[in-house]
Amino acid sequence: LLGAREPEIYGATAFEDYLDRLRELFPSLDIVYFQSNHEGDLIDYLQQDEVRHAYGVVINGGAFSHYSYAIADALRMVEAPLIEVHISNTYAREDFRQRDVLAPVCEGVIIGMGLDGYRLALANLSSRRV
């Protein structure tokens, strides 16, 4: 629902449109996009072999980031570098967003940079390619 939900926080650009731009910026990366509002679907996706052994994983856990130990455990199984992205500055928002249970599992976290956080994450992963 990016582009429709709370545009004052998340912006007005649909993620699918931004994804096209990311694919243009990083043609050497095979960018695969998965989104679900269901915790179990996210866990099942992360546990797939092609994800666990991917070159890198960028995750925005949304509100799951603040309480889903199950997703954190699934991320621990991923052998690829993990980067967490949050579009908004979660530390400038509600108290419950001050805790992030996914961050300790990730190599890096990009918070509050808008959609550009995804570009920064992919640039980091791209720079590791030999």
Residue positions per predicted region:
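Short, glycine-/small-residue-rich phosphate/pyrophosphate-handling segment
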Residues: 32-33, 83, 92-130
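Mid-chain, well-packed structural core segment of small domains
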Residues: 53-91
